[in-house]
Amino acid sequence: MTIWEISEKADYIAQRHRRLQDQWHIYCNSLVQGITLSKARLHHAMSCAPDKELCFVLFEHFRIYVTLADGFNSHTIEYYVETKDGEDKQRIAQAQLSIDGMIDGKVNIRDREQVLEHYLEKIAGVYDSLYTAIENNVPVNLSQLVKGQSPAA
């Protein structure tokens, strides 16, 4: 392979990598705007916004993380939950980000309402488990949130 062939491939790799990173940033912006501009009371608070992941505090007790999976050219978005004190961060869902700006092949990352709805579908099990625990006056176990199980009454 000549230096020019390698140069051409390197340019292609860099361009595609930049494009994927741009799509990730657009998704993050749409999700943050969707949450902050929503009239619904989701009890989400923005906690941190580093380059790699988003973090929201839920009910002042749980953290929800949204991040691109590790690895070069990863198209997998991962959703995690942990307690606010940092107990055992666990994945609750995944989605796929395409190079053309779609999530799971159906959600346009530029549409903040669609992005928010998709995100809420991914974390709905957390809300369901918390609701059931509160309704039945029982404590919440993080592993139950991850599995989407209702705490025992």
Swiss-Prot record:
Matching InterPro entries: Tscrpt_reg_HycA
Effect of inactivating the gene: Increased expression of the hyf operon.
Chain segments annotated as coiled-coil in the UniProt record: none
Keywords per UniProt: Transcription, Transcription regulation
Keyword Transcription attached: yes
A Pfam family recorded for this sequence: HycA_repressor
Function summary: Regulatory protein for the formate hydrogenlyase system. Could act by directly interacting with FhlA or by preventing the binding of FhlA to the upstream activatory sequence. Also down-regulates expression of the hyf operon.
Protein name (Swiss-Prot/TrEMBL): Formate hydrogenlyase regulatory protein HycA
Species per Swiss-Prot/TrEMBL record: Escherichia coli (strain K12)
